[in-house]
Amino acid sequence: EEIIDVAYQSPEMEVGFNVSYLLDVLNTLKCERVRFNLVDASSSCLIEDCDNSTAEYVIMPMRL
């Protein structure tokens, strides 16, 4: 289990991801900051580089 710092301004939610999929995306982006676009804890998550949105990745959360 990893806990990361986020800038989040909406109601609290808990979401989990398969670490292999998440690491694949993060290793591909190779940037300092990423943006996770979430609607709710069960919908797909769009991940992109904060400074360059030319590449977008979608991963599905796991049920907790």
UniProtKB/Swiss-Prot annotation:
Protein name: Beta sliding clamp
Keywords: Cytoplasm, DNA replication, DNA-binding, DNA-directed DNA polymerase, Nucleotidyltransferase, Transferase
InterPro entries named in the record: DNA_clamp_sf, DNA_polIII_beta, DNA_polIII_beta_C
Organism of this sequence: Actinobacillus pleuropneumoniae (Haemophilus pleuropneumoniae)
Molecular-function GO terms, alphabetical: 3'-5' exonuclease activity; DNA binding; DNA-directed DNA polymerase activity
Family: Belongs to the beta sliding clamp family.
One of the record's GO cellular component terms: DNA polymerase III complex
UniProt keyword Oxidoreductase present: no
Location(s) in or outside the cell: Cytoplasm
GO BP, sorted A to Z: DNA strand elongation involved in DNA replication
Function: Confers DNA tethering and processivity to DNA polymerases and other proteins. Acts as a clamp, forming a ring around DNA (a reaction catalyzed by the clamp-loading complex) which diffuses in an ATP-independent manner freely and bidirectionally along dsDNA. Initially characterized for its ability to contact the catalytic subunit of DNA polymerase III (Pol III), a complex, multichain enzyme responsible for most of the replicative synthesis in bacteria; Pol III exhibits 3'-5' exonuclease proofreading activity.
Main location: cytoplasm
Assembly and interaction partners: Forms a ring-shaped head-to-tail homodimer around DNA which binds and tethers DNA polymerases and other proteins to the DNA. The DNA replisome complex has a single clamp-loading complex (3 tau and 1 each of delta, delta', psi and chi subunits) which binds 3 Pol III cores (1 core on the leading strand and 2 on the lagging strand) each with a beta sliding clamp dimer. Additional proteins in the replisome are other copies of gamma, psi and chi, Ssb, DNA helicase and RNA primase.
Lineage top rank: taxon: Bacteria
Pfam family, one: DNA_pol3_beta_3
